Amino acid sequence: KNISMETPILEGKEYSFNGGRIKVIGPKRGTMLKVAEKIEKQMEHSGGKYIGDISHVEDIYEADSSDTNKASIIAVLEFEDKKILFTGDSTAENIIEAVNKYYPQEKFVMVKLPHHGSSHNISRELIKKLNTDQFIISTNKTVEKVVLYRFGEERKNTELLCNYDWWKKEYFTENGIK
């Protein structure tokens, strides 16, 4: 589906756009390595791979019902004519409502996806609504395959920026990579 991934995203990484920039100031490489070791152990415990083909994922969306997540901050960084959407741990429904109210037709430079890429916070409707080609997922676990399935079905030529290389560890079957 032509979705590329970049990792790790560490302090010192910069993204520039028309006179503006985003500079990543954390996490430090050492912190990332500690967490990466934990992830590696989790993967070893699970046999080192995630069985199941992404093309056979059952896509049943169950919305996040947490009041604290519903109250999570949704913010937009604006510089000149560029905008980056930060969604915190908010719900898909709240993000769609906020974007419809304040930025109904806006193209964002990037969107930081909510709640570590949780399938309960990322619906197909949200993926369709967010007008961008670059999404950030920050998580210390593997992203649920159903979220990647939703992206594959709803978006083309999308770049997912991740802080870990979880997908390189036999996460996909050969068919799932296609």
Task: Write out the residue ranges for each language-model feature.
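Glycine-rich loops and low-complexity Gly/Arg-rich segments
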Residues: 32, 47-52, 99-101, 111-112, ...
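Short, solvent-exposed loop/turn segments at secondary-structure junctions
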Residues: 29-30, 91-92, 167
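Serine/threonine-rich low-complexity intrinsically disordered regions
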Residues: 53-59, 123, 163, 168, ...
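Flexible, acidic/histidine-containing loops and adjacent segments that form or flank the divalent-metal
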Residues: 1-83, 158-159, 175-178
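Active-site-proximal loop/helix segments of hydrolase catalytic cores
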Residues: 57-133, 137-138, 143-146
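A short, polar/proline- and glycine-enriched secondary-structure boundary/capping micro-motif
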Residues: 35, 95-99, 171-172
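Binuclear metal-ion centers of metallo-dependent hydrolases, dominated by the metallo-beta-lactamase
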Residues: 1-23, 103, 131-178
